[in-house]
Amino acid sequence: MPTKPARDLQTFPNPKPDRPYEIAMECPEFTCVCPVTGQPDFATIRLRYVPAERCVELKSLKLYLWSFRDEGTFHEAVTNRICDDIVQAIAPRWIEVVGDFAVRGGIHTVVTARHGERPAGV
């Protein structure tokens, strides 16, 4: 497995696909670049999902998130891209991606992207 930034999300079989359960992850060191100013933007990315047949492998997720560090992108775009890419990789029953960005210009931005319907009782 690579040890440098990569957009390739690795997956593995869900060990309990018949049981709806939630997986939650947090990356407090996410960085991208403001496409307007060229300055770095810092965020905590929070993922919560209910897997179907596949799960996201953690090291590949770290390297995937790391791959945005030099990319110019708006908060809204990158949060939705992360959600879309994970949906493409694992087709979860439900997913929520929250981009909680550090204050910039006196404004604190939180972007939430969701896909699917959260199963009842999870």
UniProtKB/Swiss-Prot annotation:
One GO process term, biological-process aspect: queuosine biosynthetic process
Positions annotated as active site in the UniProt record: 34 (thioimide intermediate), 41 (proton donor)
Enzyme class: oxidoreductase
Keyword Cytoplasm belongs to the record: yes
Gene: queF
Highest taxon of source: Bacteria
GO (cellular component) term, any one: cytoplasm
Keyword terms: Cytoplasm, NADP, Oxidoreductase, Queuosine biosynthesis
Gene3D superfamilies, per the entry: 3.30.1130.10
Name the record gives this protein: NADPH-dependent 7-cyano-7-deazaguanine reductase
Chain sites annotated for binding substrate: 56-58, 75-76
EC number from the UniProt entry: 1.7.1.13
Principal cellular location given in the protein's record: cytoplasm
Pathway participation: tRNA modification; tRNA-queuosine biosynthesis
Swiss-Prot/TrEMBL catalytic activity: 7-aminomethyl-7-carbaguanine + 2 NADP(+) = 7-cyano-7-deazaguanine + 2 NADPH + 3 H(+)
Record's subcellular location: Cytoplasm
Role noted for this protein: Catalyzes the NADPH-dependent reduction of 7-cyano-7-deazaguanine (preQ0) to 7-aminomethyl-7-deazaguanine (preQ1).
Database matches in InterPro entries: GTP-CH-I_C/QueF, NADPH_dep_7-cyano-7-deazaG_red, QueF, QueF_type1
Protein species of origin: Anaeromyxobacter sp. (strain Fw109-5)
Similarity comment: Belongs to the GTP cyclohydrolase I family. QueF type 1 subfamily.
GO MF entries: preQ1 synthase activity
Pfam families assigned: QueF
